[in-house]
């Protein structure tokens, strides 16, 4: 085992041109780990706090020099000398050093950067790929991509209310073919939109962001694109939605679809999702209701939880306390996993473990503000969760993760597994 001899943070840019933090950890063996931290656009109120400088004269107040300084001046002296492979102890030390329930003192971005860089340095020292270091010999499941090919909501400047329309290539035999199928549908969608005189500009995550007459029209153009690419909707490729309903939820306790000019109650939202699920091959809905609409979520789960993956993102924020509440209430049946929602690798792995034990699925996810860092590709294989959400097959910040997964599948060889429809192991298919 090797101990930490240096920790250094710097300010870099993310995919939206905003500053974020990158951390390097060096061990006495000479091994170095580097990690960059992502940032979200639609963020849950209960996420760990991302520390920003607030100096309007610099990066419009979004600089992260305070977080950088916290790593270099506060966290580094505390961790230098610790063994890099003691991940749980290192993460615990940073949580205690921060001392707040939401990491607001040092910043979840500062803490996460160090947490991930430590893991990468430890893997490097052992000569192991990160997925194998984190997951051991049983890390072998490649994920089904949940690929965002049409954007609305906060991820785009258009009149579409639902934030993400995604495709999932469940009929593929392996990850390599799954990626090909998604890419072909993505290009097919571009042609379909062109033929209708619609925009093919892209949103934060690489998906197209046209103005459409309704949210349902978005589903229809995607189904047309799937068929024109030569695939069968519902067999080869299924659909997933992320309404990001918290963003629609207003003080009147109702959901405002501003693009369509429609206001819905919780009950009407559930009926809306039921109608879409009955008409289209939709297998997953993320944040179908707001993060504090627990009673609505319970009803949604009772009505759709046996046949659709109901994913809690803002609802659970990768937090074991909120996930535990959801499990006890019978709310949702899946959790979205975002490293920066909770702020350490250890707590992220704890959330995945809790979900699995309760029979919930888990989906490892990017954020809308990404970097070239590919940690989540290794994490999804390490944990065998079988699903990843990391944008369209466009923009290098998204494609970097897919390319890393191609490398991992190649390295695993005949051991690699692709779950396909079995990724949804807790719903009737």
Swiss-Prot record:
Keywords for the protein's UniProt record, in alphabetical order: Cytoplasm, Glycolysis, Lyase, Magnesium, Metal-binding, Secreted
Pathway note: Carbohydrate degradation; glycolysis; pyruvate from D-glyceraldehyde 3-phosphate: step 4/5
Task performed by this protein: Catalyzes the reversible conversion of 2-phosphoglycerate (2-PG) into phosphoenolpyruvate (PEP). It is essential for the degradation of carbohydrates via glycolysis.
GO molecular function: magnesium ion binding; phosphopyruvate hydratase activity
EC numbers on record: 4.2.1.11
Cellular localisation: Cytoplasm; Secreted; Cell surface
Protein name: Enolase
Residues noted as binding Mg(2+) in the record, renumbered to the chain: 242, 286, 313
Catalytic activity: (2R)-2-phosphoglycerate = phosphoenolpyruvate + H2O
Keyword presence, Secreted: yes
Cystine residue pairs: none
Cofactor binding: number and manner: Binds a second Mg(2+) ion via substrate during catalysis.
Membership in a protein family: Belongs to the enolase family.
Positions annotated to bind (2R)-2-phosphoglycerate: 163, 338, 367-368, 389
Entry annotation: catalytic residues: 205 (proton donor), 338 (proton acceptor)
A Gene Ontology cellular-component term: extracellular region
Cofactor(s) the protein requires to work: Mg(2+)
Species in which this protein is naturally found: Caldanaerobacter subterraneus subsp. tengcongensis (strain DSM 15242 / JCM 11007 / NBRC 100824 / MB4)
Pfam families in the record: Enolase_C, Enolase_N
Matching HAMAP family: Enolase (MF_00318)
GO BP terms in the entry: glycolytic process
Main location: cytoplasm
Main enzyme class: lyase
